[in-house]
């Protein structure tokens, strides 16, 4: 059984979502159509935290009860999952590098504000943008992201996400993943593959 562990970026990230629909609700409807065709052959999982986050964007009454039927909500078993020590070492080192980078961003902003006192507000906005990028881009920056990784490890699932941090750490931990930008094509191919398989069985 193929098991996919889904991130919100499939339905919320505009660049990814447009393959499924214009809005998160339309994207979810399209996805659920694929899930229906793959029912019994492919399973789709979400940690409860990710699911709750997603439902802030999706009109629940328009996707129920299918969303309950085709998306399995499961928390990772945080007490029994073993994390390799090197992952903790890498995470600590990554955080240290990001703190140093954040300090350099702040120092640059201070120097700019001393030189150009008339544009302090713009400099602060730039500081916030660059500081956020330095500290958060490419890292697991929420409990929900970490739950996604842990659940995929626990069930030997395939993570589907457009989040660079999630995919980077999935790779570090030896977890299979699919870029969310290609997920619709993957689903279409799976539907066709199973249809061909059924046709061959009927001919026999």
From Swiss-Prot:
It is an enzyme of class 3 (hydrolase). Its EC number is 3.1.26.5. The keyword Lipid biosynthesis does not apply. Keywords: Endonuclease, Hydrolase, Nuclease, tRNA processing. GO terms for biological process: tRNA 5'-leader removal. It comes from the Archaea. Belongs to the HARP family. This is RNA-free ribonuclease P. It comes from Pyrococcus horikoshii (strain ATCC 700860 / DSM 12428 / JCM 9974 / NBRC 100139 / OT-3).
